[in-house]
Amino acid sequence: MEIDTSVFDFHQKVKEVILKEYKLNRELIMLKRCLRYKCMSPAAFYVQVLEVNNPYLINDVTAVTRIITNMMKCVPQLRKDGGKLKDSEIKELEDFIPGYIRYLQIVSEYALILFRGNPLPAVELLKWDPKLPLASYVFVDMNDIYTVSAIREHMDVDRILFDMVLDWCNVSSGWSGNVQKIRRTFRWYYEAVFKADEVIYVDRDEISTENLILFLFVYEEVIARQQPMNAIHTHGSYWNTFLKEFSSVPITMRSQDGGNKYIRHSILTAREKIPGKHVKLRSKEFNLFIHNGRRKLPASDVYTATLQIMWELTGKCFLDSSLLNMDKLREGMMFRKIKIRWHSIRDDLVITRLHTLNREQVIMRDFLVRCNVDANAKHKRKRLKPVETLTLFEKSRMESQNITLDYLLYTHSRLISHKAWQQTNKTSTLSAAQLNSEGHVISGKPDQVESQQ
């Protein structure tokens, strides 16, 4: 049995390109002769070879750019003539060229290492092709003040809004430094702010609207909603991924006790013109299947999130803990079926949505949610094929970043309102230190503050 050494050999080619660019001839000879140099991981190669010989090499941005260009030349071409393939052709050839994606991934790993400590790495990440994959274990130091400043200067955005984005990164990933999350977050931010006239849609033609599958990832979605971010939470946007006619409406909700159990106050922010048609639910019962992405029983927070999602579709919801009687539900089921019935309830038990841009209250039908065990859940679980649907969900590029996009649009609208208030009152631009998390002025005399609020 032959061992495939193509990936191992590609590592050596990339290391040779780096050493030749920095003119480290001794290390280049050691790379060709010494197995220890050949087996070094990208991080170990940087620490034990590059940083030891010259810690200032990474500051040469021009050299790093040339290295990345030369590394990309080492990647095998998909066509003999060197031409680029279409997306459809690439998908067809992925089965025949399993190492192609891995080669691009290796290039990105070494590129991030070369940019470490330089104030421009995150800026370069924004310029890279979004199709370029990055390994989940690749990290960058986003706590570096120079890196963060370079991102903000490159985007030329307001300091207040940018700080809000950083707060969201802190909540969603806990500043883990995961490159995929960081780059995806700022890419969504870039599209949301600088392409404000466009609404981003997802191809949902292959998703059925009769039996909708909701994927909730426990550690990425539910936990993110449990952690407070200035007492503001974002919910419900993952539902839009599975509805074709429903626009991506940013939604933020604020819980009563800072947790995620009961919602009493909520705010909907949206653009003045949102193309597309909203989903009109008929007065009949339909099925909603909840799956948490794992062979584990969905937690009570999942059902709470379901109430929030149904609130997004209808504008009103009835929040009653007696509806979520977990003792009546059988343990060990991967899927749980929730029957949705229309029901009239008192106005004081209803939360309504509010457009913060035009200040018009959205009046829609209310409903009641009942949780029952479906006798045919096991049969339908096999028929729905959750793995294939999960693949479609990942290809939609939305994943957990739906919440991020909604939050960024919300902060963008706050910034617009703040600037409009500045123009009306003919005041100078306020610095970030003069605003608190709610956007109110905290400097000046108390009487002036109250009058401004």
From Swiss-Prot:
It comes from the Viruses. This is Uncharacterized protein ORF71.
